A protein has these predicted regions:
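Conserved hydrophobic/aromatic beta-strand scaffold that supports enzyme active sites
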Residues: 5, 13, 21, 30-32, ...
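Glycine- and acidic-residue-biased ligand/ion/polar-headgroup-sensing regions
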Residues: 1, 27, 111-146, 152-154
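Generic recognition of flexible, low-complexity loop/linker segments
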Residues: 3, 18-21, 86, 96-100, ...
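Ligand-binding loop in jelly-roll beta-barrel domains
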Residues: 20-39, 148, 152-153, 160-188
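Intrinsically disordered, low-complexity coil segments
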Residues: 52-55, 86-92, 101, 140-148, ...
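Loop-centered beta-sheet repeat module
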Residues: 1-47
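Short acidic-glycine-tyrosine-enriched beta hairpin
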Residues: 3-15, 139-163
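C-terminal amphipathic alpha-helical segment
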Residues: 41-123
Length: 188
C-alpha cells in the first residue's frame, strides 16, 4: 500500500537520491556506488538481520520519516530514477553510456560495453571501476605506469589519478563475448 516494488534485472540502474525509500529484493546482486552508504542511512526495516554483535540491527523510524521525500510517487520514480542511461561516445568495439548518479550526488558513473580494447583517462581524478559483465579483462598502462593485471567478474579496482591513460581489454578467455565496466569518479 505504501511502498512500490520495481522488478530488477541484470544491468538495471537505479538512482537513489537522499530521501528515497529503497531496499534490494531477495536474490539480487547490487553494486552500490555511494559516498556514505551507512553513515546517513535511516533503516525503516531490516528484515530481522543481526549485526556483528549478534543483536538485531537498529531501525530509525522517527529519523527516517523526517527525511523521506513524500513527493516521489511511483510515476516520478520510474520517470527520473530507473535506467536513466545516456549515450556518450562509441568507437570500434566499444560504447560508453552515462548511468548517473543523481544530479544531487557528487559522483559520476559511466558504463563501458566493449569487445575490443578501450582507452580510458583518469581526468586527473581517482577512477574506481568494477567488471560487471564478462569473465575477465586485462588492465594495462600504455605508458608503463603500472604492471598489467587481470580483473574478474564483480571485482573492483582503483586507478590512481596520476596514471593518466590506461587501457581495459578483453582477455583471451573473454574472446567473442561483450564485457562491461562501471567507472565512478568525483565530479569536478
Amino acid at each position: 500500500r505504501f511502498v512500490n516494488r520495481i522488478p530488477a534485472k541484470k544491468h538495471d540502474h537505479f538512482l537513489i537520491p537522499a530521501g528515497t525509500v529503497h531496499c534490494s529484493g531477495a536474490g539480487t546482486m547490487v553494486l552500490e556506488i555511494s559516498a556514505t552508504p551507512y553513515i546517513f542511512t535511516f533503516k525503516l526495516w531490516d528484515w530481522g538481520r543481526l549485526g556483528l554483535d549478534g543483536l538485531p540491527r537498529p531501525v530509525h523510524l522517527e529519523h527516517g520519516e523526517k527525511v523521506i521525500d513524500w513527493q516521489r510517487d511511483a510515476q516520478w520514480v520510474h520517470q527520473h530514477l530507473v535506467n536513466q542511461f545516456e549515450p556518450v561516445a562509441e568507437g570500434n568495439g566499444w560504447r560508453e553510456e552515462r548511468t548517473g548518479l543523481h544530479e544531487r550526488e557528487f559522483i559520476e558513473t559511466r558504463r563501458h560495453w566493449f569487445s575490443e580494447p578501450v582507452l580510458h583517462h583518469t581526468g586527473g581524478g581517482v577512477n574506481v571501476l568494477n567488471l560487471v559483465e564478462g569473465d575477465e579483462a586485462i588492465v594495462d598502462s600504455p605508458t608503463g605506469a603500472f604492471e598489467p593485471f587481470t580483473v574478474h567478474y564483480a571485482e573492483t579496482f582503483i586507478i590512481p589519478a596520476s596514471v593518466g591513460d590506461y587501457r581495459i581489454s578483453p582477455s583471451a578467455r573473454a574472446s567473442g563475448h561483450p564485457l562491461a565496466t562501471i567507472k565512478a569518479w568525483v565530479r569536478s
